[in-house]
């Protein structure tokens, strides 16, 4: 073939490919952002090992409003590496613990006693800060368990509610706190319903309600377990499963809107596990509230079958989809991560940005179904230009694969733990069971920022605030910059299987900032508008100044 013919052929193929892409995306008009050159690894941020072993692998975690973290695994695999205290009743002759209570402030832990199996379960904090933990496997799949925080580190333990059971089994389900304080429990393996806790005959919520969307999103690999669930400021739910998403009125059981399919071939829910968050809700006196959902990672169609039956590990998803759900005509903005990732955890930072952490570059969730751990977290800068949002951060030395977790702590660190891609505890081979806890310290904790780091002195409303209440937050710092401070509420999510249930950030409306002394100021703000914006319960309150957050203090919203 002559060079002219070769050139014509290349141009023809290129144009054909371009027009094919345009035709594919014409229907949903989604936008794909061309990525900028990969960011270099930044020196900011560092890792620290907190505990080389807590005796169990962290499959589920929940931060409590007394700076304790409840961590638990499953009970059906045999003994763990942590014994129950002498004299404790041993369920099934297993005298080892499958749950611990970790004290953030003292970096200590103690064993807790679980009776029924919590394997792949779900949970939420109620409005009083009590963990309502639901479902699991086998004899635990209909169970409701509670954990009530207590002042003494040694006096709390699990309580199983034998008189109150779930209507349907809940294994791989998702929970969310609602504006009235109830909790919705949605989905699960081969369960296409939702229900509420607590049960109430008067409200007629003592039964489960069928949801066709859960049937429609199930494929041969399932790919709709642990559906992503976000409460929106209009009081409705955003539900995402597989590649599909809807706006759902749970009170009337009506689908109000079907959003466009997220573009591409990647599936986003278990076992092709991605993650999702509701981006920060910024309350202000000007302009409408912007409501956006971010979905990142996952695996291509068919990836689970290849990994699980043939041990062929295809590359994970490289894309994130961002959807402004309250637009008149919502369309996905697709962005390319610098590293492919399945089983990512997504953690909202007090700055309003997102850390994407944990997971693998090939394979899916499941028993020994992933390889090539992704050791580098990635910072997603929410307000940067679309092609400049990702920054690769310093790596951990510890792979965190299937059944690993990550969540924000009040001082701004990220607690990271777990990883057990095996059916039991295995401490040999390529990716052994991981019992350690570590923390990733983001760049903003560097001492060089101490002069502009705010420190909360007091909260005018005390330990609680009413909806819409105006209140003051006194804070101190050395170098104050006018107009550079805001206050934000961060909810403590229940985290498992790469999804932080109830994860939420609300930037409070600012009235004014008043200088009290040379180095002390008062930020006057308004409490959240209502329970749609911030469901009742405990939040971490942060003051952020020039992009540097204070340590968080606990505030109850009622």
Where do the model's predicted regions map?
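Ser/Thr/Pro- and often Gln-rich low-complexity regulatory segments
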Residues: 2-558
């Amino acid at each position: 073939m002559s060079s002219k013919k070769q050139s014509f052929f290349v141009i023809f193929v290129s144009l054909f490919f371009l027009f094919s892409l345009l035709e594919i995306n014409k229907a949903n008009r989604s936008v794909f952002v061309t990525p900028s050159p990969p960011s270099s690894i930044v020196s900011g941020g560092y890792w620290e090992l907190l505990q080389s072993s807590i005796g169990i692998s962290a499959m589920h975690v929940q931060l409590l409003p007394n700076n304790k973290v409840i961590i638990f695994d499953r009970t059906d695999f045999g003994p763990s590496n942590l014994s129950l205290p002498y004299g404790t009743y041993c369920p099934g002759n297993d005298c080892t613990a499958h749950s611990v209570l970790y004290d953030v402030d003292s970096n200590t832990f103690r064993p807790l006693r679980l009776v029924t199996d919590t394997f792949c379960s779900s949970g939420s904090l109620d409005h009083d800060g009590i963990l309502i933990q639901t479902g699991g496997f086998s004899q635990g799949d209909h169970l409701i368990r509670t954990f009530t925080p207590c002042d003494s580190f040694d006096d709390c333990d699990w309580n199983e509610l034998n008189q109150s059971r779930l209507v349907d089994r809940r294994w791989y389900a998702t929970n969310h706190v609602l504006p009235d304080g109830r909790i919705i429990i949605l989905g699960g393996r081969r369960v296409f319903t939702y229900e509420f806790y607590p049960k109430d005959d008067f409200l007629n919520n003592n039964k489960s309600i069928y949801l066709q969307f859960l049937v429609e999103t199930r494929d041969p690999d399932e790919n709709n377990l642990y559906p992503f669930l976000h409460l929106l400021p209009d009081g409705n739910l955003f539900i995402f499963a597989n590649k599909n998403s809807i706006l759902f009125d749970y009170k009337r059981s009506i689908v109000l809107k079907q959003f466009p399919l997220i573009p591409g071939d990647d599936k986003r829910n278990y076992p092709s596990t991605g993650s999702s968050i509701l981006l920060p809700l910024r309350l202000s006196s000007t302009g409408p509230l912007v409501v956006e959902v971010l979905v990142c990672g996952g695996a291509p169609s068919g990836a689970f079958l290849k990994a699980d039956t043939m041990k062929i590990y295809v590359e994970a998803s490289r894309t994130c989809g961002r959807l402004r759900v309250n637009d008149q005509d919502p369309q996905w903005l697709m962005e390319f991560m610098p590293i492919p990732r399945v089983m990512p955890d997504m953690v909202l930072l007090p700055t309003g940005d997102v850390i994407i952490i944990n997971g693998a570059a090939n394979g899916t969730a499941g028993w020994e179904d992933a390889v090539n751990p992704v050791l580098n977290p990635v910072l997603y800068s929410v307000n940067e230009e679309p092609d400049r949002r990702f920054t690769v951060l310093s790596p951990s030395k510890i792979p965190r694969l299937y059944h690993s977790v990550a969540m924000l702590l009040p001082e701004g660190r990220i607690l990271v733990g777990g990883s057990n891609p095996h059916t039991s505890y295995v401490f040999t081979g390529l990716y052994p069971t991981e019992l350690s806890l570590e923390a990733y310290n983001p760049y903003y904790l560097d001492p060089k920022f101490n002069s502009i780091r705010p420190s909360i002195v007091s909260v005018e409303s005390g330990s609680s605030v009413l909806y819409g209440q105006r209140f003051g937050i006194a804070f101190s710092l050395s170098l104050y910059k006018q107009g550079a401070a805001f206050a934000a509420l961060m909810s403590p999510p229940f985290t498992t299987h790469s999804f932080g249930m109830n994860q939420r950030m609300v930037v409070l409306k600012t009235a004014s900032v008043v200088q009290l002394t040379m180095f002390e100021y008062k930020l006057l703000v308004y409490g959240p508008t209502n329970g749609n914006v911030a469901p009742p319960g405990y939040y971490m309150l942060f003051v952020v100044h020039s992009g540097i957050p204070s340590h968080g203090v606990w505030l109850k919203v009622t």
